[in-house]
């Protein structure tokens, strides 16, 4: 069975993306995989190791929280899904995973947490559009 | 998912897009509008003898031909399908139709007939992505 990747970062558009992905999955007969990408922590090498560890823990907590919220929506619709956490640059990681044979396409919110309010399309969605070789649904 | 808009220019990617749109529409019994937008011909101002109306009429006919070819390629369907040909700037016209008709999803080919092979995302898809406030599915 084919799967549809849903990019989740806990933001409102990404949760809307989950709902849209449920519809799309019903149409193309696919199962959902919710994906959270933890961006690399970029700090100067002199940073106290404990600080980096704490940041990484905080990131992992955020990932679990966002995935659980998204999974609740899928469960509410009477569906099941898999949860995936990746580490790396968000758009690139999603595009790489989308290369897998099982993947039909990717659903992503137009803007995540970091976008400026006046832009319609955030940088991750924009970049994913340009590098992904499978269908991409942008949800607003 | 009640109304789906598909934009087509007769390219392979847009035909694939139309297939996906029909597939998604089926379980929801959604209405599908297949739209072909022909760009206005721009001639230098010192060509006043050019029969613009006739040129545009023949361009609109070309759009209709693209639509009938697309529908023929998709074969018979039980879906509620309508078609529309419009003359205007392509991305802007698709966006305008999507928003005024409150479509639940807009489906586009990632690149049409004009795009260079090596680019993954054509200019029309890119522009619609940035302009449109409805969910957009780009199919490669």
Language-model regions, residue ranges each:
Chain B
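Small/aliphatic-rich secondary-structure junction motif
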Residues: 2-50
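Short glycine/serine/threonine/alanine-rich loop segments
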Residues: 30-31, 79, 103, 134
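Short secondary-structure boundary segments
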Residues: 36-37, 109-111, 140
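Short, hinge-like loop/turn segments at secondary-structure boundaries
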Residues: 49-53, 100-102, 124-125
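A short acidic, glycine-rich active-site loop
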Residues: 51-65
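Structural beta-alpha unit
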Residues: 72-106
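Glycine-rich, Arg-bearing micro-motifs that act as flexible, cationic patches
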Residues: 105-130
């Amino acid at each position: 069975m084919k799967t549809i990747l849903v990019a989740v970062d806990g933001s409102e558009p990404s949760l809307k993306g989950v709902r849209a992905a449920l519809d799309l999955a019903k149409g193309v007969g696919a199962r959902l995989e919710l994906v959270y990408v933890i961006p690399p922590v970029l700090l100067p090498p002199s940073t106290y190791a404990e600080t980096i560890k704490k940041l990484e823990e905080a990131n992992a907590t955020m990932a679990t929280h966002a995935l659980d919220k998204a999974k609740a929506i899928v469960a509410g619709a009477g569906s099941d899904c898999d949860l995936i956490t990746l580490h790396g640059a968000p758009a690139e990681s999603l595009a790489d995973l989308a290369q897998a044979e099982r993947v039909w396409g990717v659903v992503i919110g137009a803007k995540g947490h970091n976008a400026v309010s006046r832009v319609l399309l955030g940088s991750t969605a924009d970049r994913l559009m340009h590098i992904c070789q499978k269908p991409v649904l942008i949800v607003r | 998912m009640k109304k789906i808009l598909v934009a087509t220019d007769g390219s392979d990617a847009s035909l694939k897009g139309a297939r996906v749109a029909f597939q998604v529409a089926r379980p929801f019994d959604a209405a599908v509008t297949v739209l072909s937008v022909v760009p206005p011909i721009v001639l230098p101002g010192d060509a006043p003898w050019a029969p613009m109306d006739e040129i545009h009429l023949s361009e609109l006919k070309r759009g209709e031909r693209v639509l009938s070819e697309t529908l023929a390629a998709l074969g018979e369907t039980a879906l509620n399908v309508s078609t529309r040909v419009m003359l205007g700037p392509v991305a802007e016209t698709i966006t305008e139709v999507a928003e005024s008709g409150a479509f639940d999803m807009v489906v586009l080919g990632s690149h049409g007939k004009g795009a260079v092979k090596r680019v993954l995302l054509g200019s029309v898809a890119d522009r619609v992505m940035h302009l449109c406030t409805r969910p957009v599915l780009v199919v490669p």
